[in-house]
Amino acid sequence: MPAPQCASCHKARAALRRPRSGQALCGSCFCAAFEAEVLHTVVAGRLLPPGAVVAVGASGGKDSTVLAHVLRELAPRLGISLHLVAVDEGIGGYRDAALAAVRRQAARWELPLTVVAYADLFGGWTMDAVARSTAGSGRSRACCTFCGVLRRRALEEGARLVGATHVVTGHNADDMAETVLMNFLRGDAGRLARGGGLGSPGEGGALPRCRPLQLASQKEVVLYAHFRRLDYFSEECVYAPEAFRGHARDLLKMLEAARPSAVLDLVHSAERLALAPTARPPPPGACSRCGALASRALCQACALLDGLNRGRPRLAIGKGRRGLDEEGPPREPQPSRPLTSEPVPDF
């Protein structure tokens, strides 16, 4: 049976049926619709004002690759400028290949690129070193806890280094639905309440962050990358298989099989969630060490680094953080090297 005609241009043969709407589109019309929807998300949400210098968190994976490509297409209409910021977590045999993909993208799209490294920012600590430090104590799960906090801080530092006014990340609807499930299963009411919306306004001196792909499903992100023939890195992190997020992802797939709208339902439910006044966490203050937003004396990044430098990495996770205040000062970390912008190589 021949493929139906594209429901948009009525000329080309349809190449796909959109998972959300069931509309049959050719590849070109699908990509145009995808870009128009991202544009609407940005404009309607007032996420990136004209004149914004936008740091794009670039990992080399499909989501950040699609985000960078779409924003590059939309930049003239939005009146924004882009700067790719990549984070080198120090994961041997994995991150080097991903960074190579980012460098190819930067060269092909003529976008400036800056790479910041954990080792430079965090006293010599890399994720491989963190993994060795947490070996034998739920290593993979602990690694993801450390990496999520440190990567967020590294991206913020990289964005400041390049003079960015806003930070964007490639989180899609599936990512956000998984996060909602994780916070619900952990009983983390505070994070559930903070998880709604398309980003954060930049409280306490932090740069405003947003997620322009938050309403786009993972399937459509993959389809866009396919039809635009984008070059991206697709291997999973070596520390990811045992992470709690994987269990939330499996649960989400089962929910989606029974209810196709489950992903966006979860995303929108987080936006509508409101906590009772007695359940709301206190307003964040400033970290006593680095000045970043913090709900306690130390922010998450400083608390995790304290645990590592004391040789007790698990102490800084969850309720164990309270114990850090009762101990003496940590060992002095190794001196950090200054951050530098990395020129884009010629390819």
Curated annotation (Swiss-Prot):
Keywords: Cytoplasm, Phosphoprotein, RNA-binding, Transferase, tRNA processing, tRNA-binding
Family annotation (Gene3D superfamilies): HUPs
Subcellular location: Cytoplasm
Gene Ontology molecular functions: nucleotidyltransferase activity; tRNA binding
GO cellular component: cytosol; cytosolic tRNA wobble base thiouridylase complex
Family: Belongs to the TtcA family. CTU1/NCS6/ATPBD3 subfamily.
Protein name: Cytoplasmic tRNA 2-thiolation protein 1
Species annotation: Bos taurus (Bovine)
